[in-house]
Amino acid sequence: MKQDSRFPNLFITDHPLIQHKLTHMRDKDTSTRTFRELLREITLLMGYEITRNLPITTKRVETPLVAVDAPVIAGKKLAIVPVLRAGIGMSDGLLDLVPSARVGHIGVYRADDHRPVEYLVRLPDLEDRIFILCDPMVATGYSAVHAVDVLKRRNVPAANIMFVALVAAPEGVQVFQDAHPDVKLFVASLDSHLNEHAYIVPGLGDAGDRLFGTKN
């Protein structure tokens, strides 16, 4: 992973496989089915990177040869929380990696002024649990900020929250960092800028529409 000196809490997963698959996702001619499969695959690969610092303890197990104290992840099961609707496509990849994880949902849509409007919150029990929030895009950053706000208002500590996205605009990352400098943001690409319609450039279009085969 690499970092950008402008954004201390931003981590960019620049693995060649991730970048290769992301290029195919950007292609406007990529089919809905392939887009969906690539999103799942990239998220799984990113999940490997973002979970590398999970707390570890040991468990006594019997191998065919000997008893040994072997490493296992400590604490409660992870919680994966997609930001609806496009985040659903990322939760599948994370569940492939951590099938025992709990799953919550935060439903947010963008109003005409690009501010988030919340319509759904369903979460597992919060105490002592690590949360991975996921949404393919961090454009204006407002939805990502709102999703973290939902957890913090329920007393989830910042150290137990991670946000993962495919692509982000610098404007959105700045908004996220200003609001939550204590929460790590993981992306596959920091793109150039937002256009006049608040779309990421070069981006990959509307992730939700491309994922579900709908039109905005």
Swiss-Prot record:
Co-factor note (free text): Binds 1 Mg(2+) ion per subunit. The magnesium is bound as Mg-PRPP.
Listed GO biological process terms: UMP salvage; uracil salvage
Pathway, per record: Pyrimidine metabolism; UMP biosynthesis via salvage pathway; UMP from uracil: step 1/1
Activity modulation notes: Allosterically activated by GTP.
EC number annotated for this UniProt entry: 2.4.2.9
Positions of uracil binding: 200, 205-207
Molecular function as annotated in GO: GTP binding; magnesium ion binding; uracil phosphoribosyltransferase activity
Keywords of this entry: Allosteric enzyme, Glycosyltransferase, GTP-binding, Magnesium, Nucleotide-binding, Transferase
CDD domains assigned to the protein according to its UniProt record, in alphabetical order: PRTases_typeI (cd06223)
Cofactor names: Mg(2+)
Annotated residues for binding of 5-phospho-alpha-D-ribose 1-diphosphate: 85, 110, 135-143, 206
Reaction(s) catalysed by this chain's protein: UMP + diphosphate = 5-phospho-alpha-D-ribose 1-diphosphate + uracil
Top-level taxon in the UniProt lineage: Bacteria
Annotated family: Belongs to the UPRTase family.
Function statement: Catalyzes the conversion of uracil and 5-phospho-alpha-D-ribose 1-diphosphate (PRPP) to UMP and diphosphate.
Protein name: Uracil phosphoribosyltransferase
